[in-house]
């Protein structure tokens, strides 16, 4: 497995992981019609923008064949007004690669990037029914607040977690 910073040529591979992992992660959480309508093409366009955006950092995990099997995205959301803070905006792996330490590797790269930026307080948003919340809790994230959101007509609970000292996370790797 290899983890590296993403380049524009990775957009299609990231989009495939994004769509496929949403379909498995959010099955029975987000309406099926919404998930089935997700498009590789539109997500490729999204990732072209995300990779190119200044202040946004995207990392990919590749298998031994060089195929992208996971990714993480981080930076600072426009809605984040806290000084010296950032946001983990996405971390997804294809289902068959979960539980093998790859997510940990991606999280480490994100936190090393935050350390380089001088960020010490990190936020991540996760749907309440998404089991990834336990991954964040394992690495020391604490619940900051909750809010209701609507996706495809379904009202869902969004949990906002925070890490308030990235050094405490980095020593776990």
Where are these regions (language model features)?
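Acetyl-CoA-dependent GNAT
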Residues: 5-9, 19-29, 35-96, 107-109, ...
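Conserved N-terminal entry element of GNAT/NAT acetyltransferase domains
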Residues: 1-12, 167-173
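C-terminal "cap" of GNAT-fold acetyltransferases
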Residues: 86, 120-133, 137-139, 145-173
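Short amphipathic alpha-helical segments
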Residues: 1-2, 12-16, 89, 104, 122
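Conserved glycine-rich acetyl-CoA-binding loop
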Residues: 67, 90-108, 115-117, 127-134, ...
């Amino acid at each position: 497995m290899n983890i590296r910073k993403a380049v524009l040529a990775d957009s299609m591979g990231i989009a495939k992981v994004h769509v496929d992992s949403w379909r498995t992660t959010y099955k029975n959480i987000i309406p099926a019609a919404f998930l089935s309508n997700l498009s590789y093409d539109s997500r490729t366009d999204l990732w072209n923008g995300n990779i190119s955006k200044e202040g946004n950092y995207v990392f990919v995990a590749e298998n031994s064949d060089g195929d992208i099997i996971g990714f993480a995205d981080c930076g600072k959301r426009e809605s984040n007004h806290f000084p010296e803070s950032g946001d983990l905006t996405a971390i997804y792996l294809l289902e068959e690669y979960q539980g093998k330490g790859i997510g940990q590797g991606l999280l480490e790269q994100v936190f090393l990037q935050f350390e380089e930026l001088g960020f010490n307080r990190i936020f991540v948003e996760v749907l309440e029914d998404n089991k990834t919340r336990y991954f964040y809790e394992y690495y020391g994230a604490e619940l900051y607040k909750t809010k209701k959101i609507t996706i495809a007509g379904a009202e869902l609970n969004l949990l906002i977690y925070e890490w308030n000292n990235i050094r405490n996370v980095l020593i776990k790797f």
